[in-house]
Design a protein with these regions (language model features):
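Extracellular/luminal ectodomains of metazoan preproproteins built from arrays
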Residues: 163, 426-465
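Cytosolic C-terminal tails of single-pass type I membrane
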Residues: 498-510
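Extracellular juxtamembrane-to-transmembrane boundary of type I single-pass membrane glycoproteins
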Residues: 457-483
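Non-transmembrane alpha-helical segments in soluble domains
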Residues: 1, 60-63, 67, 93-96, ...
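Single-pass type I membrane-protein transmembrane alpha-helix
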Residues: 66, 475-499
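Non-catalytic, well-ordered alpha-helical segments in soluble enzyme domains
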Residues: 373-396
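Serine-hydrolase-like catalytic core of hydrolytic proteins
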Residues: 1-144, 148, 184-187, 191-211
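Substrate-gating cap/lid region and adjacent catalytic-acid/histidine neighborhood
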Residues: 115, 153, 157-374, 390, ...
Length: 510
């Protein structure tokens, strides 16, 4: 079992994931690796001067070493499972579609990371290289060879420090030095490749994520609606989005997460604003920053756009390939002996790794000391290692005496979108949060993939007729957006009805 660590492609290391308990309990060989990170691992000039993806090439070199040498450790070179979390999970997905990775592994597990997330692949690498070169006072930022020659004369630590400066201005500093479509490791963007027949390694895969997602305390973020707008636009990474498209997208997000499903205080404040606007005592745009998402709502937005929606889109695309067996999960366990889980909102980013690597069995002095923690760890280890051995996390006729509480993990298919909820008592459900996933995977692309074209003229100091036309065009855009939203939600409702409702448990065959 070959583990690829996460860390936004710029931090972390294999040494933080001790594999001895997983290896002993699961009777497998565990390999953890390091690879080049940040600007040293993923700088790309978008040409042959510096193609990028050096961190991924390091991973391939490690996989080749395993293939050539694992037999000396009692392993099978034709039975290698790659698994990774967060950016490491995205790397797993990229290896699935890379021609350079073919034949180096036989199974794959992508945990809380998808190669089709907007953060997973950089579409504007040249911009950040030029920004870095300016920070380092390179003489010519327009010539790739000159930039590279300049960088090679500068101390690596200084380059790393300035690469952090080069990301300033990006909301939450999503990774900017990250994998690129270089024409060799990654022939095209992941979504395009996943839609092409024969474009991926025909191996079993399962992917999933946590029930909740936090890796920083949202209460420490001075969040406003304007900041949320910038964050959304940064994540969708669409420079051509017009002001009206961005406003409609932001309004749709607020409608979905705050106004429709927000807290009682949100609804109360919204009604007060609507009353003021109807009385003419408050202009419409004055409420731009006054209704803010609470911590849970903010975490849900970040989780959905970063990880959950891309994970669902990934498994849906994988079902188009008959040669690939797909399993999907959600980790939903939070120990009462976990200070991070108590501080945030339950299971959090990377929390399942503690159980997969057997931390509750390592006699920690300050966390994960409960009997339930050990039981969940045993469950996760068995599921992960059974998949590594058999290509099925709950194989029938194997280890029957150790079956996870008569739990059978069913495949995720185009006809039956099953997923497993993992915790003390795993169970199978269907239609994973389908309304919100449909919102991000089908409704939002209407604005990010297809620009709304409007006149660049402003309404200030223009004739009355032109002003009316501008307002009419604006109204038409909003009306179209609302109609599309209604259609998407209707389709979602039909799907939910077809699948017998969200989170409806499926009888488990014994």
């Amino acid at each position: 079992m070959f583990f690829i660590h996460g860390g936004s492609y710029k931090t972390n290391g294999g040494r933080f994931y001790p594999g001895e308990w997983l290896a002993a309990a699961g009777q497998v060989i565990v390999i953890t690796i390091n690879y080049r990170l940040g600007v040293l691992g993923f700088l790309s000039t978008e040409d042959d001067t510096a193609k990028g993806n050096y961190g991924l090439l390091d991973q391939i070199l490690a996989l080749k070493w395993v293939k050539d040498n694992i037999a000396a450790f009692g392993g099978n070179s034709s039975d290698v499972t790659i698994f990774g979390n967060s950016a490491g999970g995205a790397c797993v997905g990229l290896h699935l579609i890379s021609p350079m990775s073919r034949g180096l592994f036989s199974k794959a597990i992508a945990q809380s990371g998808s190669p089709i997330g907007e953060w997973a692949v950089q579409r504007r690498p040249r911009m950040y290289v030029e920004r870095l070169a300016k920070k380092l006072k390179c003489p010519d930022v327009n010539d790739s060879a000159t930039i590279l020659q300049c960088l090679r004369k500068i101390d690596p630590e200084q380059i790393i420090d300035k690469s952090e400066d080069a990301t300033l201005g990006e909301i939450f500093c999503a990774p900017v030095f990250s994998p690129v479509a270089d024409g060799e490791f990654l022939l095209k963007y992941p979504t395009t490749m996943l839609q092409q027949e024969g474009s991926l390694s025909p191996v079993p895969l399962y992917g999933g994520r946590k029930k909740a997602y936090q890796d920083k305390d949202p209460s420490s973020i001075p969040f406003t609606k304007d900041l949320l707008r910038k964050y959304l636009l940064h994540l969708v990474r669409k420079d051509f989005m017009s002001g009206i498209a961005a406003d409609v997208l932001l309004h749709a997000v607020y409608t979905e997460y705050v106004y429709r499903h927000g807290t009682t205080s949100h609804h109360k404040k919204r009604r007060q604003q609507q009353h003021k606007m109807s009385n003419g005592t408050m202009p419409y745009y004055e409420n731009n920053s006054s209704v803010l998402p609470d911590i849970r709502t903010l975490g849900k937005i970040i989780s959905d756009i970063d990880l959950k929606a891309p994970s669902v889109k990934l498994v849906n695309l994988l079902t188009l390939h008959p040669s690939v067996s797909v399993y999907m999960y959600e980790f939903d366990y939070a120990s009462s002996d976990d200070v991070i889980a108590n501080k945030y909102v339950g299971s959090y980013h990377e929390s399942e790794l503690y159980y997969i690597f057997g931390f509750p069995h390592m006699n920690l002095s300050n966390a994960l000391r409960l009997p339930e923690d050990k039981e969940v760890s045993n469950i996760m280890i068995q599921l992960w290692t059974d998949f590594a051995k058999h290509g099925n996390p709950t194989p029938r006729g194997v280890n029957e005496e150790n079956m996870v509480k008569n739990f059978t993990w069913r495949q995720y298919t185009e006809e039956e979108d099953c997923f497993a909820t993992l915790g003390l008592q795993p169970f199978v459900a269907r239609s994973y949060e389908s309304e919100r996933m449909t919102f991000w995977n089908h409704f939002v692309p209407l604005f990010t993939e297809y620009p709304i074209l409007i006149s660049p003229n402003h309404t200030k100091n223009v004739p009355f007729e032109e002003c009316n036309f501008t307002y009419l065009l604006t109204f038409a855009g909003w009306l179209l957006a609302i109609i599309l939203l209604i259609l998407v939600l209707h389709l979602c409702s039909c799907k939910m009805f077809k699948n017998f409702g969200v989170m409806k448990k499926i009888p488990i065959p014994v």
